Amino acid sequence: MRKVAVFGKPGSGKSTLSKTLAKVTGLPLHQLDSLFYQKSGEPVAREIFDKAHEDILISESWIIDGLGPLGAFKKRLDAADTLVYIDLPYPTSYWFVTKRLLKGMFIKPEGWPEGSSVLKGSIQSYKMLRLSPSFWNDEFMAEVEGMAQHKTAFVIRSLSELKAFIEKHAR
């Protein structure tokens, strides 16, 4: 476990899991939202993102949390030796986004880009969740299963599995 890609729908616990893995393994954590978005909440220029992303991919070790542009996502999956796909039920993800929004009125969420609006980000998360079934689907799951033949892959489908994964890897 030297190059770890953590991905899934918005509000699935990626940041919490990634932070725990980074703390336990000592691997550097790169939260994609912090690379992709400026403090204003606007995306950085694509060339700037691509260069930063590529520099991380060629480094010796990393944990990258998030999705980002699809081309970059595919490169990340290819470069990773470990895939962690968090595929929680949609109602759970919607609840986590709502909870993050409500708590975000008082405390900045973990992994949230510095200076970015929690409200704008939450609205974007709701939009992404609405579109998610067109991407996070059986076809994508088949791709992950195919990659699992030459990589370590974990698919987490419930809160109890998420908790067990964190507890197991937090030792």
Residue ranges and their predicted role:
Residues 30-82:
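Conserved nucleotide-sensing/catalytic segment adjacent to the nucleotide-binding pocket
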Residues 15:
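Walker A/P-loop
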Residues 9:
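P-loop (Walker A) phosphate-binding loop of NTP-binding proteins
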Residues 24, 128-171:
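NTP-dependent small-molecule kinase module
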Residues 12:
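ATP-binding Walker
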Residues 88-136:
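A glycine- and Lys/Arg-enriched "phosphate-lid" helix/loop adjacent to the NTP-binding pocket
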Residues 6:
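Hydrophobic anchor at the beta1->P-loop junction of P-loop NTPases
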